[in-house]
């Protein structure tokens, strides 16, 4: 049996554990963001990397390489103004890139924070003209999603205010409800509207969608195809994110995740670099809900800004970490855990739970990759391929001069 201690994992033979693990890994896919390959940074600036992608084609090429190495990233999240600056006119080019590189367009992310008109908000702006502009961009994003066959429209807004008394919070709620209802009316039957929340930044007095309760309300108001999007970095320190996940699962409002890690706020560090146990706990709640007939149709997405780590290396590392933590959580003996919880055997329950987390699942993930014709160690394979060095040579003159965010 793999490491982790006696009684910490489901009581199966090694062959049965491998069979179970392979099934769990077969079910796991995670979307990677186009902007994660570009020269993104912080509000204080950024450090350019020669191998960073500077065009939508280079982003697709990088995404395809990550999928070739890991086998679990078949879709690329797109940011409308960064990746499709001409809107629907850019769709044919994106479709051609899908065919060329073998990865598909994933979630469509509207950009409601970049234009100068959004200084005082987008869908919540006191100006009806600006609100109409923002709503028009939402509807354009939905049409782009339809044209690309993308299911999810992932909405994050920077709307809020910095000083007490400067905005009517309730008026802004009403404007937002109206815009989301209208957006929902334009969804195709197979599309979803995912409403993301964030407690602060760039607004520091109030943020219009600040927590999961507000997102839940807005999703219900918008319509039956709306769900909540949880960004793991968009919470106050020490907040119990897995409890939020459990509530959203219970109320059938969990639509997906933007995965990243943080030490203080929305740091956009690589997943599991600071608190891997938290991600394990989140995945456990999802596995437990799935056992109860809930938890299906959850979109797993990465949302990170690789300002110091190499873009490709960080993305591959994140995908591998996500697989490992997902599998660790799958290996919890939930039947035995339920028995221990019912009897309030606190130490035994916690030790069983922690034992799965401490289990070294790398032999299982490596065996799964080999069984699927993938490199056993994707990071080593990336390094040995010379891909990053080739990209640096080909892109360096452009990437080191780029000034836009993504």
What is each model feature region?
Residues 7-37, 41, 45-47, 64, ...:
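Histidine-acidic metal/acid-base catalytic patches
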Residues 12-24, 100, 105, 117-223, ...:
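Active-site acidic/histidine proton-transfer and metal-coordination neighborhood
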Residues 23-36, 50-81:
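Catalytic domains of carbohydrate-active enzymes, especially glycoside hydrolases
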Residues 27-48, 110-125, 157-163:
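N-terminal small/glycine-rich loop or linker at the start of catalytic domains
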Residues 36-38, 80-84, 109-114, 157-161, ...:
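Active-site-proximal loop/turn and secondary-structure-junction residues that shape catalytic pockets
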Residues 41-57, 79, 120-136:
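Active-site mouth loops of central-metabolism enzymes
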Residues 47-51, 75-92, 161-164:
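Glycine-rich, proline-tolerant flexible connector loops at the mouths of alpha/beta enzymes
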Residues 51-66, 135-142, 238-247:
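Short, acidic/polar
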